[in-house]
Design a protein with these regions (language model features):
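FIC/Doc superfamily catalytic core
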Residues: 1-167
Length: 167
């Protein structure tokens, strides 16, 4: 999936695990020499999860936490999560711009404080938001997304006390 997702960026090594340690701010991700083993062990736990939503949340976290590629890790994490949901006939999860800070801080809560509650709540809300949003016609969708603040910058929305709303 990563190879297909990143095919237009051959310099990023589509489908190849990273060769150098990657960072996001102060966070240092899994050492390149441990990526494959970490993913294999993570996959063993994944196999024990019973629901598509649990597998989606876990897969999103696993890929985000390991950061196995030089680029495209967040995108592939969301692709992998949605593949779980689609395979089970469930609604996808989308993280609109206004909700990005919520998503990232929920990932941090799990990564740094071993607290899965925030990411489960954030992704559950995102999935319910997708289910409630009318996607059938472009103009109707655009209006609904604007009305529910989906396009707002997360920081501007936070400063104004504005949140993503269910349609």
């Amino acid at each position: 999936r990563h190879a297909r997702l990143m095919s237009a960026r051959p310099e990023k090594g589509p489908g190849q695990f990273k060769r150098e340690v990657n960072r996001a701010g102060q966070t240092v991700f899994v050492d390149p020499g441990h990526v494959e083993g970490t993913l294999r062990q993570g996959f063993e736990l994944y196999l024990s999860l019973e629901t598509a939503f649990a597998r989606a949340v876990y897969m999103m976290f696993l890929v985000s936490e390991v950061h196995p590629f030089a680029d495209g890790n967040g995108r592939i994490a969301r692709v992998m999560a949605n593949a779980e949901l689609v395979a089970a006939g469930e609604e996808r999860i989308l993280v609109p711009t206004v909700y990005r800070a919520n998503y990232l801080s929920a990932l941090k809560a799990l990564s740094q404080a071993q607290d899965p509650g925030p990411i489960v709540r954030v992704l559950d809300f995102a999935q319910r938001w997708v289910a409630a949003t009318p996607w059938m016609d472009l103009e109707g969708t655009r209006v609904a997304l604007e009305r529910n603040h989906a396009f707002m910058d997360a920081n501007e929305a936070e400063n104004a006390g504005i949140r993503l709303r269910l349609p």
